[in-house]
Amino acid sequence: MNTPLTRKPLVLGLLLATGLGTGNAVAQLEEVIVTAQKRTESLQDIPIAIAAYNAENIESMGLFNAQDVGMASPSVQMPLYPTAGNNLALFIRGIGNADSVVITKDPTVGVYYDGVYAARSTGLLADLSDLERIEILRGPQGTLYGRNTTAGAINFINVKPTGELGFKQVLGAGNYGSWRSISHLNLDDIGGFKAKFTASFSERDGWVDNRGPNTIPGLDYTDYYLRETQGFRVALRYDGLENLVVDYSYDYSDMTSSPGYHQYGGPVGGLNPAFQPITDSFRDRLEETRSPIGGQPTAYYLPETDTEVDGHNLTVDWAISDSLTLKSITGYREFDDDASQNFTESFGNAGSLEVWTVTEHEQFTQELQLLGNQDRFQWVAGLYYFEEEGTQTEQQYLDRATVDLTGIIALDLTTFPPTPCSDGSTSDPFCSDFTMFFPLYLGEYAVDVDNESWAAFGQATWNATERLDLTAGLRYTDDEREAVRTHDGLLWNSFGPGVSASDLDETDYTLIADYRWTDDISTYAKVSTGFRSGGSSRNGLDFNQAFDKETVISYELGWKTELLDQRLRLNGAIYYMEVDDIILDYLPDPVNNPQFVEVFNSGEAEINGVELDVTWAMTENLLVGFNYAYLDYDIKDAIFPDGSDRSDTTGLVWAPEHAWAASVDWSIPMGFGEWLLHADYSWQDDQLALANTNFGEVLVEDFGLLNARASISGIEMLGGDWQLALWMKNVTDEEDVSYAIGATSFTFLMPRTYGAELIFEF
C-alpha cells in the first residue's frame, strides 16, 4: 500500500507484546515490520495472514525454543516427534507432516533461516538465542517460497551486527537442574566491517527417572526428557561500499537429549508375550519408569540422542539504483542425528520396542532475486536452486517376541513356545534358556536420498488506484527425486530393498485484490496454490511403490484494521482450501506393528477455517492480546491401500477444531526501573495424534497451559543496564496427554517448571 500511516517505527510482535513505553501521553500500538514478501513492509499493509514475534517478545514471553512459539500460535501445532528428542512435527491450518524425521517424505511448512530453506526440521529445538524476529505465514506460499509450503512458512531472522561495541549476558536457572547462558558480543565497525558473536548453553535434567533393580552394568539408562544444548553463531557484515551490503553467518548447534516417555495406558488383565499378567495401567503422568507387569520401577535401555547442526549463509544485497535491487542468498546446511527411543512396554503385547535411527544430511541452496519499485509497480523476479543428499539407517529390536509378530518374523510363541527353564517352567522371561532369543533383532535398513529442484518465479503488485492494489504471481518448479532402500539381508527383515524415483514439474500462482477503505481499515481477497513433493514410504513394506505430489488451492478473505486511534488492532481471515491427492499415513497395526507406515495419495481434503488476531492497548501501560483459530475439514474419495473406501473415518492429525491464546502485559514504571508482568494462556481442542489405522483413531484430549513471567528492567548500575526476571510454565501443573500411539502408548505434558533470569547489557 502507498498510503502513509503514522505509527511508531519499532518492531513489535502481532499476537503478544512486552508492553508499551511510558513516554507517550496516549497509548498507541507499535508498528510491526516484516519481510514476508521479500521486501521490508508493515504487517498491516500486506495481504497475508501472519504472526510476528520480535526479540522483546521472545524474551518477555519466555520463549526458549520453537515449540514454545507454536503453543502461542493457535493455528500452529508443533508436537514433539516420538522417536527423536530434537525434532518437531509442524502443522499449520491442519496440514502437516507427522513423520518429520523421515527423509523420504517432505514437510508442508517451509522453515527458513535468514532466507535459506531448511529441508528437514531436525535441530529445530535448538535454543532461540540471537533472533531479531520470527514470522509465521499461514496458508500456501507456493509463489514466493516454493515447494513444500502448502501449509505455510516460518522465517527465523537473526540479528545483524551493529558496528558498535556492546555486550549482553543472559544467565538463568530453574528446577529439574536447568540452567542457561547466552552471550552476545558486538564489535566496533572497522572500515565497514562489522562482527557479532553469540554463544549459548543450556541444560535440563530428565523429569522421568529411568531407574530400576533390573539395570545391567555398562548399559545406558538415560532419563527421559533430558536436554543439553550448546550453540555458536558468527555474523559478519560489510557495508563499506555505497549501495552494497554483504552478510555472512555461520551457526552451529550441538544437542543432547532423550525422547518422551511412553507410558502403558491400556487395559489390564490378560498375558503379555512372556506369559506375565498385565496388572497396571498408568493413566496419570509418571515421573519414574514403571512396568505394567506388577507396576514396579523398571529401567529401560536408552542411550542419549545426539544431534549436530551447522550452516553457512552468504547474502549479497546490491542496490543497482533507487528503484532496482539485486539480491543473492547462498546457503549450505548439514546435520548428523543419532536418535534412540525405547517405547518401554507401552504397546502391551508387543513388548518393548527399541528404535535407533542415524541420519546424515546435507543441502545446498542458491536464490537470486531482482526487486523493483517503479511508479505504481512493486515487483520481484527470481531463480532458485536446491539439492540435498541424505542417508538414514534404522535398527529395531524387541525385548521379547509376541504372538502378533508373525508378519515380521517366523516366530510365534503359541506354536514355538520358549525353551523351558531349568525348573521346567516357561513363566520367567529372564531365565538363561529364554534370554537366548532376546533382545529380538528385527533388522536394519538404510535409505539414501538424492533430490534436486530448481524454480523460476515472479510476483508484481500494481497500485491501480490510491486505495486498490492488485497482485499476481507465478512460479514454475522442476523437481527430481531418487531414493534407494537396502537392508541387512536377514530373511525376517520385512523392510526389503527397493528404488523410488520421480521427475515432476508444477506451476503455482497467486492472485490478490487488496482494498484500503480508510487509512486504518483494509480487506483483501486472495487465491493461492502450492504443492508438496512426492516421495516413498521409508517404513513401508514395498519401497518401490512411491507416492505422488500433493497440491492445494486456497481461497482467503482477510482484513487488517487499527481502530480507536491505533490502540486496537483487529486482524483476521476466513479461508477455504482444497487439497488434492492428499498424502496420508496408514498404520495397519499400530498396536503390534507400530513400525509399519504406508504413505499413499488418496482423494481430496476440504479444509475451512477462521482466524482472529486481536491486540488492544487498553491503557498506556496495559496491553492484552487474544488469538483464535477455528478449523473444519472433510475428506472425500479416501481409497486405502487395502482397497477400502474410508472417506467417513479418515482424519487429519493435529488439526484441532478450536484453539485460542490470550495474554496480558502490564508495565509499571518505578523510580529505579520498570516492572513488567506477563501472563499467557493457550488452549487446544481435542485432536487426533494417530488416524487411518485398522484399530480406529487415537485422540489427544483438549488441554490448556498457563505461563507467567515477572521482570524488573532498566536498572542502571556498574556501567550497564540490568534486568531480573522470574518465570513459570504450566503454572497449574496440568497432567494431560501430549502424544499417543495406538490405544495404549501415551506421553504427557511436562510438569510445572520455574526459574529466574539475570540479564546484563552495556
Residue ranges and their predicted role:
Residues 378, 466-470, 576-578, 600-691:
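Gram-negative outer-membrane beta-barrel transporters
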Residues 313-319, 323-341, 516-532, 548-610, ...:
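Membrane-embedded beta-barrel scaffold of Gram-negative outer-membrane proteins
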Residues 237-241, 370-371, 382-386, 447-579, ...:
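Structural signature of Gram-negative outer-membrane beta-barrels, strongest in the C-terminal barrel
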Residues 19, 28-164, 557:
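Acidic, small-polar-rich N-terminal luminal/periplasmic segments of exported/outer-membrane proteins
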Residues 171-180, 203-241, 245, 258, ...:
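Outer-membrane beta-barrel proteins
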